[in-house]
Amino acid sequence: MQKQKIFYIVAFFASFLVTSLIFRGNHDEKPIQKTIAVESVTKTPSPTGISQSQDREKIAAYLAKHRSPMAGTENALLTISSQYRIDYRLLLGIARKESSLGKRGCNHNPFGIASCRKGFNSYEEAYEYLAKLLTKSAYYADWRKTGNVYDLIKVYCPESDGCNTQLYVSQLKQFMNEL
């Protein structure tokens, strides 16, 4: 009897969660079309087509140019990006949008995860957390299927939370293309 009550309670909350996810936001908008620069976000560990050492140098120069406290983490970023088969430019683009590459972040959280209520011991730990979240969580399944940045951001920073999703996508693509 007790197990049956628990089952019904869990089933109720699960159906509520699914329903709220389905009906959240304005579904009349068309997703932003993929561009060549972001088309392979989940498909290629080295999206730039250059060697990993050249990617490392490019990341180091980018972080130095922006005076980022994330400087020195290039190896970890490339390793984690390769391990989870996610474009490192996506991670850096989100970090730039959310915290100016860690300058406005808190507790080694350059991605604004949980509105900074979640802290990390290092930027490397934050990279791995976000890479794993994006590549494993059911919330991002649409994005993994399409590779469309809009499908990622409409969940990562939804309009229902006050986010300007279209602007976020536009800026994210711009940041990614800088790399």
Predicted regions span which residues?
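Helix N-cap / loop-to-helix initiation motif
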Residues: 86-88
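Cell-wall glycan-active module
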Residues: 1-84, 174-179
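Non-catalytic cell-wall polysaccharide-engagement segments
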Residues: 1-33, 117-179
